[in-house]
C-alpha cells in the first residue's frame, strides 16, 4: 500500500478537464435560464441543480484527494451515514425497529470503515453480508412485534448493503497493492469515479420516455451513455494499470453496473412512491447522486483485486 498521497500530475489533469466540463455545463444552464426568462422550464432548473451538486462533489473530492487516504475514508463514512439516513427515512419502521437501526448506524458503519482503515480485508468482506445479515433479524426479533417482520427486516438489510457495504468499496481501493503500477491508487479511484459519474451525465442528457418503471430513463439512453462511458474509459487508460483494451472492458463493466444500479434504485423509489431520496443537493439527495456508484464500486474493486494485485 502506498502512503504518498500527494496530488499527482495525472489527477490534476483529470480534475482540470472536469472543471472545464462543469464550467461549460454551468454556462449552458445559465444561458437557457436567461433565454427562458421568468418562465424557466423544470428541465433547466433540474439541470442547474445537478450541475451545482456536481460542483460540490468535485470540490469535495479534490480536497479529500489532497488530504489523502484518511480524508477519503472520512468522506465515505459521511456519505454512508447520509445515504443510510435517507434510505431508512423512507422505509416502513416503528418503535420495534429502533434498536436494529441504531446498530446499523453506530456499530456496523464504524466497524466496516475500521476494517477499511486497517486493511482487514477478510472482515471487511464478510461483516455485513454474513454477520450483519444474520444478526439484524435476531436483534429485530428480540424486540417483539412480528407484524411485517420479513418486510421490515429485508428493507433494513438492503439499505445496509447498499449504503454501507457497497459504498465502502470506494475508499478500500486505496489499500490495494497493484502490480507494476507507478501511480498512487487514488488515480485509479478517480478513473472509476469519472467513468461511472460520466455515465450518469450521458444517460441524463440522452434520456427518453417509454419505460414503465421510470419514464425519464430507458434503454435508448443506455445505448448512448454506456458506449460513451466506455470510450471515455479507453481514453483514460494512461492513468490506469490497464491496456487500452482492458480499460475499455473495465469501463464497459462499471458503466453497465452503474446504469442498472441507477435503474434499480429508481424502481425502489417508484415502489415507495417517492421521486428523490432527499434534498441534500437542492432537488436531489446524496443517494440519488451515488446510486450508480453503489453498484459499480464493489465489482470494480474485486476485479482489480483479483486480476491486478
Model segments located where?
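Interfacial loop-to-transmembrane junctions
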Residues: 272-293
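Juxtamembrane boundary at the C-terminal end of a transmembrane helix
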Residues: 302-309
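Juxtamembrane helix-loop transition sites at the ends of transmembrane segments
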Residues: 71, 107-110, 283, 294, ...
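Membrane-embedded alpha-helical bundles of polytopic integral membrane proteins
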Residues: 1-257
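Hydrophobic transmembrane alpha-helical segments of multi-pass transport and channel proteins
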Residues: 255-263, 289-294
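Gly/Ser/Thr-rich helix-start
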Residues: 222, 252, 262, 284-286
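Transmembrane alpha-helical segments of integral membrane proteins
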Residues: 261-276
